[in-house]
């Protein structure tokens, strides 16, 4: 989440060390200036960094140092999140809002194909827990349908679970989700 880390990744790769690098969504969207609000929704681990670090992370995405964008989905119970900043448990949920939150900014900096790679194929391929998904006529569909030019306001109803600790709550996102296909079945947040 800080610029110096990308320098370490680049140096390791120059030495032939097989290292991967991901950056989470919220460190690309926010910098530490929002911490002045003392809003516990911004209490994240690792913590939000300076604007210069955020821009360095974006540069790392553009030059290929960053291999994937992660969601860093960390649910926190309401009673642990809706307290004073210093008493709150760090974390934020993001699965339901990651794509519409980041798509416009990401595709203004990289191609659509690179954005899809960073948000889907690369995280699946790099994760030890997930297979790298393929698309084919005989395979079950795992797709997310995005309306890239249709804004939406994030509300607690957008989250599938009972937890809605997100710095995006109440914010207008530049894109919105239509729904998804999971194992070939159509899903919306209402029936996920």
Per-range role (PLM):
Residues 1-69:
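Histidine/acidic residue-rich metal-binding segments in metalloenzymes
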Residues 10, 81-82, 157-158:
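Short amphipathic alpha-helical segments
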Residues 140-191:
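C-terminal cap of metal-dependent C-N hydrolases
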Residues 41, 68-69, 74-148:
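His/Asp/Glu-enriched, well-ordered alpha-helical/loop segment
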Residues 6, 29, 77-79, 153-154, ...:
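Glycine/Thr-rich phosphate-binding loops of Rossmann-like dinucleotide-binding domains
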Residues 23, 39, 43, 80, ...:
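Residue-level signal for pocket-adjacent positions within structured domains
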Residues 42-53, 89-93, 166-173:
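A short acidic, glycine-rich active-site loop
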